[in-house]
């Protein structure tokens, strides 16, 4: 299944076992469905959750805020950048200070300028761990150190995602 393929009857079995293979399975763009899921979470005793999407996979942060308000569940947002393949154009030339400035701006002014401030930093690392991703990882670690926010690293789930390299850098 290719990453740009849509969910179909022909590939649904593969996708159910490997739901990260296509962007279509990760597109949570129906606030009503999302709100029901969060309400079910609350009914099961949940009180807080971390919404871990960052640029590259981030949805509508305003909808997330509305869902949190409507359900009474605390939702902690996240800043950072996802895997290389999903990077916004500016990231391809960014240096450590640029990544840090981006994260600090979201921390201080809110995610995408909304005033909704993140409580965590997340970095996605691709298979093969590119040099630019190392810059991003170092920037995220420094930003976490300076701000006191927790850092989550999402290494590639296939072989070659670099967890040992990541640990050495951190």
Please provide the spans of the model-predicted regions:
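Catalytic pocket-lining loop regions of alpha/beta-barrel enzymes
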Residues: 141-170
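Catalytic domains of carbohydrate-active enzymes, especially glycoside hydrolases
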Residues: 35-50
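Short catalytic-loop micro-motif centered on adjacent basic/acidic residues
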Residues: 48-53, 151-155
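A short acidic, amphipathic alpha-helical/loop segment
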Residues: 60-64, 169
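Active-site gating loops and adjacent loop-to-helix segments of metal-dependent hydrolytic enzymes
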Residues: 1-28, 79-97
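Divalent metal-coordination and catalytic microenvironments
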Residues: 1, 49, 144
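Active-site gating/metal-coordination segments in enzymes
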Residues: 66-70, 74-150
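Acidic-and-aromatic substrate-binding clefts and catalytic sites of carbohydrate-active enzymes
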Residues: 54-60, 129, 158-161
């Amino acid at each position: 299944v290719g990453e740009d393929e849509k969910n179909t009857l022909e590939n649904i079995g593969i996708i159910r076992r490997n739901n990260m293979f296509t962007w279509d399975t990760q597109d949570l763009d129906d606030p009503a469905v999302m709100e029901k899921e969060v309400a079910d979470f609350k009914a099961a005793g949940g009180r807080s959750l971390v919404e871990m999407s960052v640029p590259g996979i981030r949805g509508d942060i305003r909808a997330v805020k509305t869902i949190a308000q409507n359900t009474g569940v605390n939702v902690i947002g996240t800043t950072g950048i996802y895997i290389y393949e999903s990077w916004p154009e500016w990231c391809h030339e960014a240096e450590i200070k640029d990544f840090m400035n981006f994260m600090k701006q979201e921390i201080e002014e809110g995610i995408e300028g909304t005033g909704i401030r993140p409580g965590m930093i997340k970095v996605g690392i691709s298979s093969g761990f590119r040099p630019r991703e190392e810059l991003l990882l170092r920037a995220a670690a420094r930003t976490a150190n300076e701000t006191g926010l927790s850092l989550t690293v999402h290494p590639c789930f296939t072989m070659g995602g670099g967890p040992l390299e990541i640990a050495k850098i951190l």
